[in-house]
Amino acid sequence: MRKFMDEDFLLTNETAVKLYHQYAKDMSIYDFHCHLSPKEIYEDRRFKNITEVWLYGDHYKWRLMRANGIDEKYITGDADDYEKFVAYAKTIPMAIGNPVYHWTHLELQRYFGIYDLLNEKTAKSIWERANEVISQEDFSARNILKKSNVKVVITTDDPVDSLEYHIKLKEEKDFDIKVLPAFRPDKGLNIEKDDFLSWIKKLESASGIKITTYDDFLQALEKRIEFFHSVGCRISDHALDYVFYQKTSKQEAEKVFKKVLTEQHLTKEEIDSFKTYTMIFLGKKYAELNWVMQLHIGAMRNNNTKMYRILGPDTGYDSIGDFPIAYSLSRLLDSLEIEGALPKTILYTLNPAANYVIATMIGNFQDGKIAGKMQFGAAWWFNDNKDGIKEQLKTLANVGLLGRFVGMVTDSRSFLSYARHEYFRRILCDLIGEWVENGEVPNDIELLGKIVQDISFNNAKEYMGV
């Protein structure tokens, strides 16, 4: 019987052990999609206790606690931090088989040197020992990044953001981790949302352009893209809860924009017309600047209206959508390709039923010039588990080039989430090792070791170009 989470955790064969320990383990991290706060990195945030660093803002953990019958008071409410920690400690033993169970114990091991299982009995001891580590001078946002061997952090940023802290970090000479912005213009595309007009006012202020026409709007977006580029941004990110496409023209998009400025009702066709033209406009600009475009497809968000009104978005009430994506995605990408303006693109799906749709779609638009130009993004969110990661890797390998994969992202608000890169690398090495043991790929450790290192770091660095 294997020991729980020992040094060969998730490594079930000799080749996997060799690949992980000799090739993957010590590779740096290139985190090209996360939700860390650049302000907290710049200010080198320190934490009061383990609840603050671990449970604040972590809706993965919140969902489990709710499922365990924990009252909201102990999740997002006014209970004190120790009470919240104990509530989580009561929950985690019920979560065996869930990646959060593994991440919890990996983080305790890697950042606190604690190898005990977290439960109600050990909660007090772990609370005290973890907080002792947190109280040390070297436990801070920047030092956690250094300890995790992170070389690049790419945050998620609204086009109206000042990027104040990215600029300050860029100017620092003694901090050698790159902290770069990503351009996330969802609020500029979601014309049907209640906050669209108020966001336009923010865009006016940020761009210095008075927006009274669709041309003004596009010019303001373009100006913000150029500003982001000047600060080091080389990647955009779009949350496509559904994949829109409507055969359209600039004139049609202009009409829709005029209607929304006068607060008239929009049809779905009008909404999709506006989104399609605007998205194509943005894609062309990304291609011109050699940016990467990320499309996160398939989340069904804010399902619980009652809790959304109380807590707002990103609080644990999202799930997987099941709408068709193939046709609209094909037409959207093709519209850019026709004009020679399809940027490097990473497609993520939240619905694993669409794995083969995405993995085969990228093959339609590889250009024979940029290796791995079109990417099937890492297993995302609800798929970020052992089975989900393996399925994404196997699907990509079955119909594409695994060796060109740009690898894992944390997609997290937590500074401790870099343990997820270790989790991913162990699963990657185990899968390749399994193929070797079965005689499905050659036992060429140098070839396989290079592929593992490339997926762990090198491919992402080359692909992003920064």
UniProtKB/Swiss-Prot annotation:
Pathway terms, separated by semicolons: Carbohydrate metabolism; pentose and glucuronate interconversion
UniProt family annotation: Belongs to the metallo-dependent hydrolases superfamily. Uronate isomerase family.
Protein name from the UniProt record: Uronate isomerase
GO biological process, one term: D-glucuronate catabolic process
Substrates-to-products reaction catalysed: D-glucuronate = D-fructuronate; aldehydo-D-galacturonate = keto-D-tagaturonate
EC number: 5.3.1.12
Keyword GTP-binding recorded: no
Molecular function terms, GO-annotated: glucuronate isomerase activity
Pfam families: UxaC
NCBIfam families: PRK02925.1
InterPro entries per UniProt: Metal_Hydrolase (IPR032466), Uronate_isomerase (IPR003766)
The keyword Isomerase is assigned to this record: yes
Keywords assigned: Isomerase
SUPFAM superfamilies: Metallo-dependent hydrolases
